Structures are given as structure tokens and as C-alpha cells.
Amino acid sequence: MTDQKPIRARSWLFTPATRPERFAKAAAAGADVAILDLEDAVAAKDKAQARTAALGYLADNPSDGALHALRINGLDTRAGISDLEALLGSSAVPDFLVLPKTETIGHLQILDRLLTSAGKGTRLIGLIESAHGLAAAEAIATARK
């Protein structure tokens, strides 16, 4: 995985991706990172609309004064695969991609290869939400991207 210089980010502000009118406000709120959330904050029926809004904002506002993260749905879900396909096919380049339910370093390695091949220097954050993920926590936490 790609080695990058660490970024100090102490505060993270989650914004539902169904609320595009809040994206710029979140970026200006003073948090170190504004997270556009496609996962828990979005009902299943609204996933496609939220995906379009989040990727459009990230493509049109690459440097509005804040770091941006995109939390996608888990890769074991249809919505997660759709999130990833849409990101890879867009001009959006979030500073961070947040992967929920990360259970192995392999999840991050696959994402790294896909993002790198698409020319996106996006950093990865694997969220540990299960006992299986906890067992692999050291490997996940030491992933280089």
C-alpha cells in the first residue's frame, strides 16, 4: 500500500449525504475533516441520490478549506459496490475514504489498488466494527494508506 505522510485530524464532522445544503456548512464549521456519509445516515431508498450529491460536491469543491472524507457502504453490500463504482468513475477525489466493517487488511489493499489505478490519491480509513475486525486490528491500523 502507498506510504503517505500522516495528517493530524482531531475532529471529524459527519454530514448525511442526503443533505447537500449542509456540505459547505460542514466544511466551514471548523472541524478538521468533513465526512459525507453514504452509510448509516442514508436510508436505502435514498442511497443513489446521496451518492450523486456527495460525488458531485467533492468533484466541484476539491479545496474549499477543509479535508473531506467519504464514508461508503460496506463492500459486502450492493450499495457499497455501487458507491465504489461511482467514485472510481467520477472526478471526485476525497481526501479520505472511510470503509465501514473492515475485517482484514485485504479489504484496504483492494481499495488501495483500485483507487491508485484510477489516479486517486485518497487515503483509507478502515472502521473496525466486529470481533473479526478486532482480531485483525493491528494489521488494519498499520496499513500505510
Predicted regions and their residues:
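Conserved alpha/beta-domain cores
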Residues: D3-K145
